[in-house]
């Protein structure tokens, strides 16, 4: 089903998901594992289920209190986008590129907070395990935002080994022993 004709003001702005779009539900366009949804208040599926034969029964749908779909929520603006054939949350701050880009010429503006995620800590937006870059990451390593509470301050990172310490830098939680230069 195409994305056109959605109710609730979505209309032609639904994002061109084409045949992979899940249609409309509760006045909101509900993509199912299609890239770049515009008018969906919630992610189509969690990133942990991307590219693994479907998103499961909990995918899609709309969540109460979204209000007008397609905009920003929580001050994250246009964070999200497409990765691994999975619709990442539109309004959750996530890295702009994958960890596969780490240490390969730099990630540019990857990582960091895009509009503010609030306080870091816990798991948000399908971070799963924190980091994911492996050991020995350089300063341009892509890391998730708002995932993992640091165990100690930045002042102790990279000084004689991280030990069990994490590192908080620019409101972004860095995984343990990422060896980011301070």
Curated annotation (Swiss-Prot):
Biological process annotations from GO: defense response
Q: Which GO terms describe its cellular component?
A: extracellular region; intermediate filament
The record's tissue-specificity note reads: Cuticle layers of differentiating wool follicles.
Has UniProt tagged this entry with the keyword Metal-binding? no
Task: List the disulfide bonds in this chain.
Answer: none
Give a short account of what the protein does: The keratin products of mammalian epidermal derivatives such as wool and hair consist of microfibrils embedded in a rigid matrix of other proteins. The matrix proteins include the high-sulfur and high-tyrosine keratins, having molecular weights of 6-20 kDa, whereas the microfibrils contain the larger, low-sulfur keratins (40-56 kDa).
Q: Write out the similarity annotation.
A: Belongs to the KRTAP type 5 family.
Q: What is this protein called?
A: Keratin, ultra high-sulfur matrix protein
* Organism whose genome encodes this protein: Ovis aries
């Amino acid at each position: 089903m195409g994305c056109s004709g959605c109710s609730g003001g979505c209309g032609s702005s639904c994002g061109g998901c084409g045949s992979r779009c899940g249609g409309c539900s509760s006045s909101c366009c509900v993509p199912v594992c299609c890239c770049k949804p515009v008018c969906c208040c919630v992610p189509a599926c969690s990133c942990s289920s991307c590219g693994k034969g479907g998103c499961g029964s909990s995918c899609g749908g709309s969540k109460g209190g979204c209000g007008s779909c397609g905009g920003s929520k929580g001050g994250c603006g246009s964070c999200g986008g497409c990765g691994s054939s999975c619709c990442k949350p539109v309004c959750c701050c996530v890295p702009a590129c994958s960890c596969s880009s780490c240490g390969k010429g730099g990630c540019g503006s990857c990582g960091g907070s895009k509009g503010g995620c609030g306080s870091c800590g816990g798991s948000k937006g399908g971070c799963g395990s924190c980091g994911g870059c492996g050991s020995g990451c350089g300063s341009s390593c892509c890391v998730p935002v708002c995932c993992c509470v640091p165990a100690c301050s930045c002042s102790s990172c990279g000084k004689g080994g991280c030990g069990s310490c994490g590192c908080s830098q620019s409101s972004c939680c860095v995984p343990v022993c990422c060896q980011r230069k301070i």
